[in-house]
């Protein structure tokens, strides 16, 4: 996969793109990340990329010309998504990451900055994505999160496919509790079922823990999980009736 990032601060990505599984994946050419600075496409000698907002107001707004030129400089593959990182976008979810990693050869990420972007920049984007209902100083943070989440789903990044399938959100539920040695730490003991060797009981316990955690910590996820479960039951009934 090719990932092109339109960013005013390329240095922000230096450490994040070189560390851990993401760094290894890029070194192994599972994905490539190209950083493009819109200042290189500015129209004046001072390389200005922002200006005051029409109508007044605080802060500065990213100008459309450098962003359009930067995006249009990218050689596009047949299946490409242009994504604007903005607090006004749809929340980034595991489902979104799966869609992007599976259905596209190339992502072009536009990192917002300052008070925001000129509204016309939105015409470049196929979709807008947000990390959540909060404000950050820059779009580089959600861009790096998106890159990490997408690349780790690409074949070859994570050693065991089972690791991906067993994670939080993969089945719509939070993950079950994980334990390692020692079996007892400061009077806290691991659940006996995990030492039983009975894989069926362990699987049952883990599923119960997933359900319990999701109900308690993320009732919104549990509600969606239940809706999908009921829909699957209805779909099976219709299939059997045909």
From Swiss-Prot:
The record's GO molecular-function terms, alphabetically, read: tRNA (guanine(37)-N1)-methyltransferase activity
Chief localization class?
A: cytoplasm
Does the entry feature the keyword Methyltransferase, yes or no? yes
EC numbers for this chain:
2.1.1.228
Instruction: Report whether tRNA processing shows up as a keyword of the record.
Output: yes
Family membership = Belongs to the RNA methyltransferase TrmD family.
Say what the protein does: Specifically methylates guanosine-37 in various tRNAs.
Protein name, per record? tRNA (guanine-N(1)-)-methyltransferase
- Protein species of origin: Crocosphaera subtropica (strain ATCC 51142 / BH68) (Cyanothece sp. (strain ATCC 51142))
The top of its lineage is:
Bacteria, Bacillati, Cyanobacteriota, Cyanophyceae, Oscillatoriophycideae
Which gene underlies this protein?
A: trmD
